[in-house]
Design a protein with these regions (language model features):
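Short, conserved phosphate/pyrophosphate- and ester-handling motifs at nucleotide-, phospho-/glycolipid
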Residues: 114
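ATP-binding N-lobe of GHMP and related small-molecule kinases
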Residues: 2-111, 123-135, 164-165
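Alpha/beta catalytic cores of group-transfer enzymes, especially the acyltransferase/condensing modules
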Residues: 133-166
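Alpha-helical scaffold segments in soluble metabolic enzymes
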Residues: 86, 120, 124, 141, ...
């Protein structure tokens, strides 16, 4: 008999990457809090895919990550991928977990790939908890991870573009 699943065993998200046309830099908190800001950007048909799944407790490690490198670790603090580590710290999902990414474009392409990753991973973690969240909430959480937790000198357009698309 089929059962409804409120907490899935696996989730895959697809997050768009973006092009910025104007206003880059006006989305930095230090700027827009004093002067306001406006950006013109659009997402493109190039995506970052994030899969989060529960892996078997038969594996020796608690967290398995596969992106341009592979990590097998037992604690959050051991995770080298800082965005993944802090997203997991913010939205706790009981391990053991496997996180894999694939992208249509290479990292450091200048098209917001780290923010697309943060947005996709946060959506997936919420889904693993059975939570349906808004694009605005995920965009703000991704900004919190990258700007507040990781202290990256970046603005907010990438996270919002990826979360809302368009």
């Amino acid at each position: 008999m089929p059962q409804s699943v409120t907490r899935p065993r696996a989730v895959t998200t697809v997050s768009p990457q973006r092009l910025s046309f104007a206003g880059g830099g006006t989305d930095f908190p230090d700027f827009y809090q004093r002067h306001g800001g406006a950006v013109i950007s659009a997402t493109i048909n190039k995506y970052l895919y994030v899969t989060v799944k529960r892996h078997s407790p038969l594996f020796n490690e608690t967290y398995r990550l596969s992106y341009f490198k592979t990590e097998h670790v037992n604690t959050l603090d051991e995770i080298e991928n800082d965005v993944a580590r802090e997203c997991l710290r913010l939205i706790h999902v009981d391990p053991p977990l496997f996180i894999a990414t694939a992208a249509d474009l290479p990292a450091s392409s200048g098209l917001g790939s780290s923010s697309s990753f943060a947005v996709g991973l946060l959506y997936a973690l919420h889904a693993m908890r059975g939570e349906n969240v808004s694009a605005g909430q995920v965009a703000e959480e991704a900004c919190h991870v990258e700007i507040d937790m990781l202290k990256r000198p970046i603005g907010k357009q990438d996270q919002y573009a990826s979360a809302f698309g368009g």
